[in-house]
Amino acid sequence: LSLVGSEMCIRDREYGLADRLEEMNRELIALSKKAAQGKALVAADMTMTGQQLYPIGDLMFEDLVEVYKEQAKVMVEAGADLFVVETMMSLQECRAAVIAIKEVCDLPIMVSLTYNPDGRTLYGTDPSTATVILQSLGADVIGINCSTGPEDMIEPVKKMAEYAVIPILAKPNAGLPELENGVTVYKTG
């Protein structure tokens, strides 16, 4: 699994790594390929940029597609076997990433969003809408990851299943952390 933020995310957080985006992506995929020893697929991982799209922010949708496209090109050239677009909170960013990948290659694309306990993303998208839109754009798998733990994934997955004609992914985390007697604990449920 190769996980590197987009050039925009790296530059805006001022880590001084924007000029190493291509190198880091290539190296991560090479290391992953070496570790897999031909026994596993290597996924190029993309996630949120941390930027707000217009009209909330200044970033235009077309420019965001180009950011993801630049990263996708490098990952394809480096030998990625598939793409995982994950932990997304914005359907618009998901759309931009899928469009960018589709413009670059025909590798499989798995897309997963993270949902709040109310069953919507941070930006208000429900699972049914996300499923219909992302599979119509060519996603090969639609799903949910992280969020607030396994129990809160049941209803969103059921809603996805009503419309999905592609496989559904559910990849929970340990839930939200809680502090008990000064110790962080995860009450998975």
Enumerate the predicted regions with their spans:
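Metal-dependent enolase-superfamily TIM-barrel catalytic cores that perform enediolate-based chemistry
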Residues: F61-G79, E86-M88, A100
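Single conserved hydrophobic/aromatic residue that forms the stacking wall/gate
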Residues: L1-E7
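Glycine-rich anion/phosphate-binding loops
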Residues: Y15-L31, F61-K69, L91
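Short, well-ordered coil/turn segments that N-cap beta-strands
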Residues: Q37-V42, A78-L82, C105-I109, G138-D140, ...
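Conserved, mostly hydrophobic/aromatic
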Residues: S32, M75, F83, I142
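Active-site-adjacent beta->alpha loops and helix N-cap segments on the catalytic face
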Residues: T87-C105, T148-V165
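Active-site-adjacent loop and "lid" segments of alpha/beta metabolic enzymes
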Residues: A40-Q71, V111-Q135, P156-G189
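Short, thiol/selenol-centered motifs that function as redox-active sites or metal-ligating centers
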Residues: E7-I10, I144-S147
